[in-house]
UniProtKB/Swiss-Prot annotation:
Biological source species: Serratia proteamaculans (strain 568)
Gene3D superfamilies from the UniProt entry: Putative methyltransferase TM0872, insert domain, Vaccinia Virus protein VP39
Protein name: Ribosomal RNA small subunit methyltransferase H
Protein EC: 2.1.1.199
Cellular compartments per GO CC: cytoplasm
Length: 313
């Protein structure tokens, strides 16, 4: 049941304040989750305001049914397709703010049946949308050790990636793993050193989840789409939860806030310089949760909020 899983929205006020809400504006919550950000945005909109929410998790779509508000609508799909949803509604260049809350939500982690958690035994699934794509167990069954090791190293920065990958392949050849506890125990046994502050399966579970859901590619596409549809002076507010996510967001905002970089000594006319394009975003800085929020919600500890504004054309 949805109500069994509490979700505390991280950096709630800060992320919504970063959108600089106008009462008659049009906004996108690209990651509805359980609706914390959406409800706060709606509370600041007037009768003419509009909010489009997006989520690829069927449980999030079900949770959105509790919002009976003519200003609100939701799409079941990946946030990477946000520009497509905007084009369908003929709203390109009219979006006043976009909020993205990246990563996995507390209800997804806490529901053992979703297969995201190494702390709770459940099916080895890890899909954000369990109705499409391959599950973690299906991929691990057919993947080569080198491919698994690459995923663990690239997306989890796991120092024992090769050792763990070999152990996974050897185990699956004898007794295929279908449960999260089986994988978590195998990783713990394959890891020669323990960090007393972190479960040995933390990085590997993160890596497999990111790969299964193409999370980093989804972020890159969503950011490009956001830039395409934002109105002049429209805001982009993005919360990330680990360094791989934040690195993508940081580089994107930095790149588009600098404009075209011309090497010194190359002669260009004014027309050529204009054709190369200038700054399209103004980075407005970053925020992290305070001690009080981290004490109340430990999962907020690694979160980073970055805000940018679309430059006038």
């Amino acid at each position: 049941m949805l109500e069994n899983y509490k979700h505390t929205t991280v950096l709630l006020d800060e992320a919504v304040n970063g959108l600089n809400i106008r009462s008659n504006g049009t906004y996108i919550d690209g990651t509805f989750g359980r609706g914390g950000h959406s409800r706060l945005i709606l509370s600041q909109l007037g009768p003419e305001g509009r909010l489009l929410a997006i989520d690829r998790d069927p449980q999030a779509i079900a949770a959105a049914k509790s919002i009976e508000d003519p200003r609100f609508s939701i799409v079941h799909g990946p946030f990477s397709d946000l520009s497509h949803y905007v084009r369908e509604r003929e709203l390109v260049g009219q979006i006043d703010g976009i909020l993205l809350d990246l990563g996995v939500s507390s209800p997804q982690l806490d529901d053992a049946e979703r297969g995201f958690s190494f702390m709770r035994d459940g099916p080895l699934d890890m899909r954000m949308d369990s109705s499409s794509g391959q599950s973690a167990s299906e991929w691990l069954m057919k993947a080569e050790a080198d491919d698994i090791a690459w995923v663990l190293k690239t997306f989890g920065e796991e120092r024992f990636a090769k050792r763990i990958a070999r152990a996974i392949v050897e185990r699956n050849q004898v007794d295929p793993m279908t449960r999260t506890k089986q994988l978590a125990d195998l990783i713990a046994n394959a890891s020669p050193f323990r960090d007393k502050h972190k479960h040995p399966a933390t990085r590997s579970f993160q890596a497999i989840r990111i790969y299964i859901n193409s999370e980093l590619e989804e972020i890159e596409r969503a950011l490009d789409g956001a830039l395409e549809v934002l109105a002049p002076q429209g805001r982009l507010s993005v919360i990330s939860f680990h360094s791989l996510e934040d690195r993508i967001v940081k580089r994107f905002m930095r790149h588009h806030s600098r404009g075209a970089q011309v090497p010194a000594g190359i002669p260009l006319t004014e027309a050529q310089l204009r054709s190369m394009g200038g700054r399209t975003l103004k980075a407005l800085g970053k925020m992290m949760p305070g001690d009080a929020e981290v004490a109340e919600n430990p999962r907020a500890r690694s979160s980073v909020l970055r805000i940018a504004e679309r430059m006038p054309t």
